[in-house]
From Swiss-Prot:
Function as written in the Swiss-Prot or TrEMBL entry: Catalytic subunit of the glycosylphosphatidylinositol-N-acetylglucosaminyltransferase (GPI-GnT) complex that catalyzes the transfer of N-acetylglucosamine from UDP-N-acetylglucosamine to phosphatidylinositol and participates in the first step of GPI biosynthesis.
Keyword Hydrolase: no
Domain of life from the UniProt record: Eukaryota
Region (Disordered): 1-26
Similarity-based family: Belongs to the glycosyltransferase group 1 family. Glycosyltransferase 4 subfamily.
Annotated organism of origin: Mus musculus (Mouse)
Keyword vocabulary terms for this entry: Endoplasmic reticulum, Glycosyltransferase, GPI-anchor biosynthesis, Lipid metabolism, Membrane, Phosphoprotein, Transferase, Transmembrane, Transmembrane helix
PANTHER family: N-ACETYLGLUCOSAMINYL-PHOSPHATIDYLINOSITOL BIOSYNTHETIC PROTEIN (PTHR45871), PHOSPHATIDYLINOSITOL N-ACETYLGLUCOSAMINYLTRANSFERASE SUBUNIT A (PTHR45871:SF1)
Keyword Lipid metabolism set for record: yes
Protein name per UniProt: Phosphatidylinositol N-acetylglucosaminyltransferase subunit A
Pfam families the UniProt entry points to: Glycos_transf_1, PIGA
Topology in the lipid bilayer: Single-pass membrane protein
Length: 485
């Protein structure tokens, strides 16, 4: 197995594979790390994973770490770009296979990733999302190169359908020799431990967060003559759009003052349009289409109630954003959602039309009777729950733990794959690990590490990026990042 040896500013560290050895891969700094975030999902495509990577990276940069991000090219966005505070992003020219995830053969990405890891003197690889093929590739190659690895799982999976079975098997292979795993809720942790057959001791729970300065209440934007229910989500099956199509006609018939404001785009939008047409609700059901992140708050503050109909969710950031804007939240009781907000701020329902209608009627009664807490009071409570600085601090502790661990040498890694992943999958990926190791040797022969120029650090202790934006101020970059839901 390869060892990572520290190098100076003028000399890149060597990543020479050595099958029988392992070593401490942390560099000569004890308090800061060179971190590479890897995922197929990043700006300009935006969602929960993308926002998590961006915000976490900004806070880690603020704490003195060097952070870069690696993702695939999005249209004309290729090569190297810099975001706020010098966050360096590599947009790799890899082919997208499905739903913004790249195709993988394990080998085609090794030359590019190896070059980046050596050039940037990376010590910790932090991959995100089970759906990202590039994240799994980076974990696999990092272990071949002798780098410490961390993986954050943002999703919940079942165990019965074919898609879940295949994804769970891939996750078992990727995580069996990963140093540490992070989940966004305790429900997500239980799910991941079962799916990947992991030791719970190497799995930590670190939730998502929101920037409370981006989601502040504005009661004057509400129309008190009506009661507005806001829905902001992708209009897909997993988000419960079919449930929403059953709720709208039932409650609109019962409450003439009830209006629905729906933001988001997806294949299930046609169902909502059919409901609006069938029941002649054009003046009471407004479909806004895809929203950018900078517009979400302006939509939320127009409502009294926020409705979430998700059928599965590891950690729902949307309900935290809505509560931060002072809305009463009504949500399905699935996945990690019951862990997100206290009972005083959320009405939990079963994922059925009847239960959600009952929950909404309870919230409507509170609005009519004036018993809801003031939006400003709700905001002041929520803003103390989840902050990105706290997430970064807890993630930093994971990095400290990981940096003191040794990477499995090749023979132990092969034993782990065979014993942990089953006789067929285990031997197959053990063979791939050996081939990847031989390919790495070939690449090092073709282009030795010493021939790869060391990049100037935009972030970290030796950062060349001089213009630092404080996180407690509004930044233009936030306006550039769009979050289509």
């Amino acid at each position: 197995m390869a060892n990572r040896r520290g190098g100076g500013q003028g000399q890149p560290p060597s990543v020479s594979p050595s099958p029988g050895s392992s070593g401490n891969l942390s560099d000569d700094r004890t308090c800061t790390h060179n971190i590479c975030m890897v995922s197929d999902f990043f700006y300009p495509n935006m969602g929960g994973v993308e926002s998590h990577i961006y915000q976490l990276s900004q806070c880690l940069i603020e704490r003195g770490h060097k952070v870069i991000t690696v993702t695939h090219a999005y249209g004309n966005r290729k090569g190297v770009r810099y975001l706020t505070n010098g966050l360096k992003v590599y947009y790799l020219p890899l082919r997208v296979m499905y739903n913004q995830s790249t195709a993988t053969t394990l080998f085609h990405s090794l030359p590019l990733l190896r070059y980046i890891f050596v050039r940037e003197r990376i010590t910790i690889i932090h991959s995100h999302s089970s759906f990202s093929a590039m994240a799994h590739d980076a974990l696999f190659h990092a272990k071949t190169m002798g780098l410490q690895t961390v993986f954050t799982d943002h999703s919940l999976f079942g165990f019965a359908d074919v898609s879940s079975v295949l994804t769970n098997k891939l996750l078992t292979v990727s995580l069996c020799d990963t140093n540490h795993i992070i989940c966004v809720s305790y429900t997500s942790k239980e799910n991941t431990v079962l799916r990947a057959a992991l030791n719970p001791e190497i799995v930590s729970v670190i939730p998502n967060a929101v920037d409370p300065t981006d989601f502040t209440p504005d009661p004057f934007r509400r129309h008190d003559s009506v009661i507005t229910v806001v829905v902001v989500s992708r209009l897909v099956y997993r988000k419960g759009t079919d449930l929403l199509s059953g709720i709208i006609p039932e409650l609109c018939q019962k409450y003439q003052e009830l209006h629905f404001l729906i933001g988001g785009e997806g294949p299930k939008r046609i169902i909502l349009e059919e409901v609006r047409e069938r029941y002649q609700l054009h003046d009471r059901v407004q479909l806004l289409g895809a929203l950018e992140h900078k517009d979400v708050r302006n939509v939320l503050v127009q409502g009294h109630i926020f409705l979430n109909t998700s059928l599965t969710e590891a950690f729902c950031m949307a309900i935290v954003e809505a509560a931060s804007c002072g809305l009463q939240v009504v949500s399905t009781k699935v996945g990690g959602i019951p862990e997100v907000l206290p009972e005083s701020l959320i009405i939990l329902c079963e994922p059925s039309v009847k239960s959600l209608c009952d929950g909404l009627e309870k919230a409507i009664f509170q609005v009519k009777s004036g018993t809801l807490p003031a939006p400003e009071n709700i905001h002041n409570v929520v803003k103390t729950f989840y902050t990105w600085r706290n997430v970064a601090e807890r993630t930093e502790k994971v990095y400290e733990r990981v940096s003191k661990e040794t990477v499995l040498p090749m023979h132990k890694r092969l034993d782990r794959l065979i014993s942990h992943c089953g006789p067929v999958t285990g031997y197959m990926f053990a063979l791939l690990a050996v081939l990847s190791y031989l390919f790495l040797i070939f690449l090092q022969w073709m282009t030795p590490d010493s021939f790869i120029d060391v990049a100037i650090d935009a972030t970290g202790p030796r950062r060349a990026w001089t213009h630092q934006w404080p996180r407690d101020k509004k930044r233009d970059e936030n306006d550039k990042i769009s979050q289509s839901r």
